[in-house]
């Protein structure tokens, strides 16, 4: 029997145990979160990258219920265009322009107040999903969330869910991305381990030591 620290699923290898947290186990944890929070209309965004196949296999293996999946390009320009299409941004943008014009030409009471309220908004109209899972990391993941925010789809409107980010504290400091949900270890236990490790070795632990 061989113990591997990889987080990838190794097919047809009965004598290899993968110790890493792989995509399948994370998606299964996300499934439990979806059930607890009654999340039913989830879209899954997958980058067109080296680990695309691994994510697709994990989705198939877990049998997670999704509204649909979408493969996106990591090029920022292409990414923004794709997110605009997914979120129907241009339609919702036009909706608010049309509604302002309608009010301007109407005899409705308090129409000026309504118009001023609409002018403070970027879009008008619903979104056809209640949650988005993004299987990406670091700056590429931030680009996806930035595009979602640009299209007026904030974490206050839909659940922002991603894969394991517990070693990247920068996401926790991004106020515009909160609340952000991802499978993780117990934070208190992790902090306790860091303090214990530093006390013994006088240095910060790395991922392998944990």
PLM region descriptions:
Residues 34-41, 46, 59-63, 87-90, ...:
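Sec/Tat-exported extracytoplasmic proteins
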Residues 5, 20-22, 45-50, 71-74, ...:
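Structural motif
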